């Protein structure tokens, strides 16, 4: 039996509530030693994070990775910018998309794949308040149908 390759570390549940996700993309994250140890311990928060393109490189901003308990003086800054490992074509495409008004590039989840930390980033357009209410209403209707018909 094949072993599970992806190990989910953190998920940004609020992102799908606040944005219409148009496309997703997998990227590696350049982390220091104490950061990867904290990530493996699931001490990461994606809630306020976003991706920014600066000088042809993609950076993960405002993602909190807690300090490693045994890291002593070699610990990292919890909110530092972390470089995303993407191909140039992918970065250029994201830069064009980011230039559009109302488009955000946000981290959706962080997971380990074959021992490497990966982040699934999504290109999303912000939802208005009535869109959020409509989504909740549709979800409740689907839940009622499942209960009624036992699907």
Curated annotation (Swiss-Prot):
GO molecular function: RNA binding
Pfam families to which the protein is assigned, alphabetical: SmpB
Keywords linked to the UniProt accession: Cytoplasm, RNA-binding
InterPro entries for the chain: SmpB, SsrA-bd_prot, SsrA-bd_prot_CS
Compartments it resides in: Cytoplasm
CDD domains in UniProt: SmpB (cd09294)
Name the UniProt record assigns to this protein: SsrA-binding protein
Native organism: Lactobacillus acidophilus (strain ATCC 700396 / NCK56 / N2 / NCFM)
């Amino acid at each position: 039996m094949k072993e599970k390759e992806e190990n989910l570390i953190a998920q940004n549940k609020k992102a799908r509530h606040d944005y219409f996700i148009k496309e997703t993309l997998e990227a590696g994250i350049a982390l220091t030693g104490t950061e990867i140890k904290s990530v493996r311990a699931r001490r990461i928060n994606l809630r306020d994070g976003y991706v920014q393109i600066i000088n042809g490189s993609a950076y993960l901003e405002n993602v909190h990775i807690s300090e490693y308990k045994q890291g002593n003086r070699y610990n990292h800054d919890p909110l530092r910018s972390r470089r995303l490992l993407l191909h140039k074509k992918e970065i250029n495409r994201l830069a064009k998309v980011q230039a559009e008004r109302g488009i955000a590039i946000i981290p959706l989840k962080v997971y380990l794949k074959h021992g490497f930390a990966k982040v699934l980033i999504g290109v999303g357009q912000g939802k208005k308040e009535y869109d959020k209410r409509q989504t909740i209403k549709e979800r409740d209707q689907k839940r009622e149908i499942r209960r009624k018909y036992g699907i």
